[in-house]
Amino acid sequence: MATLNPRDVVIVDGVRSAMGKSKNGMFRNVRADSLSAELVRALVARNQFDVNEVEDLIWGCVNQTLEQGMNIGRNIGLLAGLPKTVAGQTVNRLCGSSMQAIHTAAAQIATNQGDIFIIGGVEHMGHVGMMHGIDLNPEASKHYAKASNMMGLTAEMLGRMNGITREEQDAFGVESHRRAWAATQEGRFKNEIIGVEGHDANGFKILCDIDEVIRPDANLEAFKALKPVFDPKGGSVTAATSSALSDGASAMLLMSAERAQALGLKPRAVIRSMAVAGCDAAIMGYGPVPATQKALKRAGLSIADIQTVELNEAFAAQGLSVLKGLGLYDKQDIVNLNGGAIALGHPLGCSGARITTTLLNVMEQQDTQIGLATMCIGLGQGIATVIERV
């Protein structure tokens, strides 16, 4: 178990919503800010502390327009009933946004710029399309290929560079669904999912506490029958081996070790190190490799010390390429044990805090000590966080 210093950054708790389908899903009548506010209220209710002490609410969100616009972080705090004295901000590092929220809060805690932070992220991809309102500079094509904006093509590129076969991708995708459904049936998500009111297919109100995107019937035969979707003629990436479009939110409570101790709150983990890194936009999915290497060096660890891993499965080709790059290809029994984004979906701004929360729960379930959460980021970045249970 880790020994804590006063300014160490500890994770007190983490929660998430169930993941809803973006097309006519269970959250089709629920706004992104309302969904997020439910999680903030739940986080406060689960942990006894004075909310007046919260320095800032930091929320990750990628497409900050429509219901996700006008500093959704501040709006979430107000909707959740936090005191008006609690500040709120929204951060955007594309797919890594809510992990960046963790890093931003952690840096402030470590430098004594606040003791208690609520962080999280959200993306309602059913209400706010991924490309809604986007106007890219034509000059950018001088610096990276236009095709680098098409995530599926970057996955195809990684697959070819790293010799990832169609068969490997299909098997990886099926296994993601199998693990996620097994985790659901065995109650392994219960500690992290907060039930939020939504609607079933017939329009009746229901409590949404089971991930809607998982396919319990996922099988190799069905996956093999699908045609490549991004490179129809010579590709290998299909809809089934890509992360699903989904709607969801996540939230975490971070504190300084000394404040958590003073409040009598038992930390679940301490943040050992953090890192971001850039890479070529054409292989954006490889970003977790340099980011993880940086984070491990800062923690004084090697990949062999990592006992549990959560990696954002943007695509099977991407995930498998990262595992090869990190030397984890033959250690998939420690990676995404409760399934990944192929089964759960990847609501962009939500995913960073979601996978970190899931990592924490898996570490507790497996009784492991040191874990890694890492993600690729569009336009060529990676982000990584190393945590240790306390």
Curated annotation (Swiss-Prot):
UniProt keyword annotation of NAD present: no
Top enzyme category: transferase
UniProt-recorded Gene Ontology molecular function terms: acetyl-CoA C-acyltransferase activity
Record GO cellular component, one term: cytoplasm
Chief site of localization: cytoplasm
GO biological process, one term: fatty acid beta-oxidation
Source taxon at top rank: Bacteria
Gene3D superfamilies: 3.40.47.10
Catalytic activity entry: an acyl-CoA + acetyl-CoA = a 3-oxoacyl-CoA + CoA
Pathway in which the depicted protein is active: Lipid metabolism; fatty acid beta-oxidation
Alphabetized UniProt keyword annotations: Acyltransferase, Cytoplasm, Fatty acid metabolism, Lipid degradation, Lipid metabolism, Transferase
Acyltransferase as UniProt keyword: yes
Pfam families: Thiolase_C, Thiolase_N
Subcellular location: Cytoplasm
InterPro entries recorded: FadA (IPR012805), Thiolase (IPR002155), Thiolase-like (IPR016039), Thiolase-like_sf_Thiolase (IPR050215), Thiolase_acyl_enz_int_AS (IPR020615), Thiolase_AS (IPR020610), Thiolase_C (IPR020617), Thiolase_CS (IPR020613)
List of catalytic residues: 95 (acyl-thioester intermediate), 346 (proton acceptor), 376 (proton acceptor)
EC number annotated for this UniProt entry: 2.3.1.16
Oligomer status and interactors: Heterotetramer of two alpha chains (FadB) and two beta chains (FadA).
HAMAP family linked: FadA
Physiological role: Catalyzes the final step of fatty acid oxidation in which acetyl-CoA is released and the CoA ester of a fatty acid two carbons shorter is formed.
Family: Belongs to the thiolase-like superfamily. Thiolase family.
The protein, known as: 3-ketoacyl-CoA thiolase
Gene name as annotated: fadA
